A protein has these predicted regions:
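Nucleotidyltransferase catalytic core that binds NTPs
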Residues: 1-129
Length: 129
């Protein structure tokens, strides 16, 4: 079974996030949606509200091939959460070069801390960018 972690603030969980999730489920058997908690970041919704919104959205999706989606909050390093789940990859959606530059730097740091976990970049579809 292949498992990936899809981290983000998801404030709120958008159609673009949903699209990245569905495309990820074509690659991985299980995806853990990791709702990041950053006390220094002002958000519209609390972490628990975001988790509940995502769980409700996932319930409406007809998951392909008996895939599984788990949603949870996390604080700290995403690689620590990935290790907890024995994930093989981190999934990052990118809308363009600015997102990519930032996410590539983060992926580099994650690779230094946890070289066994690959970061997979999925480009957002134009209608969701």
């Amino acid at each position: 079974m292949t498992l990936a972690v899809y981290p983000g603030s998801f404030d709120p969980f958008t159609l673009g996030h949903r699209d990245i999730l569905l495309r990820s489920l074509k690659i991985f058997d299980e995806v853990v949606i990791a709702v990041g908690v950053n006390q220094n970041k002002k958000t519209l919704f609390t972490p628990q509200e975001r988790v509940e919104m995502i769980e409700n959205e996932v319930k409406e999706i007809n998951l392909p091939n008996n895939n599984k989606v788990t949603v949870e909050c996390f604080e700290g390093l995403v690689v620590d959460l990935a290790r907890k789940y024995d994930a093989i990859s981190l999934i990052k959606g990118v809308r363009g070069p600015v997102d990519y530059d930032y996410e590539a730097q983060m992926a580099g740091m994650n690779t230094v801390m946890c070289p066994e976990i690959e970061t997979i970049f999925l480009m957002s579809k134009p209608e969701f960018s």
